[in-house]
């Protein structure tokens, strides 16, 4: 039997704390779509199922714990970061889904100029990363129109391309490795 919206919210609050669970109705409506349905957002006509909550993940452990809960409770999860996608991939397909927002995981953990690599979290803004690597005489080589606001998790998830992709390749050509959480075991592992 499916959990009620109230039960889902209470479960999430117990996992990540109340401050990290958004239940504001307007925010939930806007979280049911991405930029593909800009008309709906502008005119407030939302036709997609509304999620139960938006969870602001602050750590990989938050992601692990929320996915364990969702998998055990059979709740759909939509992962997002910068909310700039235009592919329809951020839309909720089932009512009372969980939108798992990684934008708070925004640390640049390491820049290695020698190997020309950076280790970043999913919520790092591409422009912020570009500004940091330029201090070392480097570039990300990735320049989509959403560069000022797009975040790494979404760029990788959508196989982003940009103005210099014919020279540097798409984002998938720039990723050396990543850590992912995989249900149903909900384990963290590098890929």
Segments from the language model and where they lie:
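N-terminal flexible segment immediately upstream of the FAD-binding catalytic core
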Residues: 1-68, 85-116, 168
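Glycine-rich, histidine-containing beta strand-loop boundary motifs that form or position
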Residues: 25, 79-83, 102, 122, ...
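Short, basic and Ser/Thr-rich N-terminal targeting/leader segments
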Residues: 48, 71-73, 80, 150, ...
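Residue-level detector of anion-binding/catalytic polar loops
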Residues: 74-76, 139
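FAD-binding subdomain of flavoenzyme oxidoreductases
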Residues: 106-191
